């Protein structure tokens, strides 16, 4: 469960390291974001000499959360960290690589480009 003011790690090579969520998109006053939700975030930590700079406003999709996700088959999955991948307006990733596993729920939310770049889908 991601809410405004939550810090997330960046799971791609776009140049940002840490994001802070400032808004969850979808719905009038959506309070919490889960895996597959698009958020508006601000870059809090970035690598030098990269296109993304600190204090830049970006869109990102949540790929891992510490809060468990219950699936229809009775299983649940939980990750060690909150992580997101920075995307553009069309929903394509800004980076060229994704680090770490991503959840299968991204494929159901039509983020197939993110799923194809990920090294592991759980």
Swiss-Prot record:
Gene source species: Pleurastrum terricola
NCBIfam families attached to this UniProt entry: rplN_bact
Gene (name only): rpl14
Subcellular localization(s) per the UniProt record: Plastid, Chloroplast
Biological role stated in the UniProt entry: Binds to 23S rRNA.
Protein name (database record): Large ribosomal subunit protein uL14c
SUPFAM superfamilies: Ribosomal protein L14
Pfam families for this protein: Ribosomal_L14 (PF00238)
The keyword RNA-binding is annotated on this UniProt entry: yes
Any one of the GO BP annotations: translation
Top-level taxonomic group: Eukaryota
Entry keywords, A to Z: Chloroplast, Plastid, Ribonucleoprotein, Ribosomal protein, RNA-binding, rRNA-binding
SMART domains: Ribosomal_L14
Subunit annotation: Part of the 50S ribosomal subunit.
InterPro entries: Ribosomal_uL14 (IPR000218), Ribosomal_uL14_bac-type (IPR005745), Ribosomal_uL14_CS (IPR019972), Ribosomal_uL14_sf (IPR036853)
Lineage: Eukaryota, Viridiplantae, Chlorophyta, core chlorophytes, Chlorophyceae
GO MF assignments: large ribosomal subunit rRNA binding; structural constituent of ribosome
HAMAP family: Ribosomal_uL14 (MF_01367)
């Amino acid at each position: 469960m991601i809410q405004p003011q939550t810090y997330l790690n960046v799971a791609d090579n776009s140049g940002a390291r840490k994001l802070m969520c400032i808004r969850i998109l979808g719905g009038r006053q959506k309070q919490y974001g889960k895996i597959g939700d698009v958020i508006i975030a601000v870059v809090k930590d970035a690598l030098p000499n990269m296109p993304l700079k600190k204090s830049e406003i970006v869109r990102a999709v949540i790929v891992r959360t510490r809060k468990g996700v219950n699936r229809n088959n009775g299983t649940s999955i939980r990750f060690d960290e909150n992580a997101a991948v920075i995307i553009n307006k069309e929903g394509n990733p800004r980076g060229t690589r994704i680090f770490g596993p991503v959840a299968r729920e991204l494929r159901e939310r039509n983020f197939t480009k993110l799923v194809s770049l990920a090294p592991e889908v759980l």
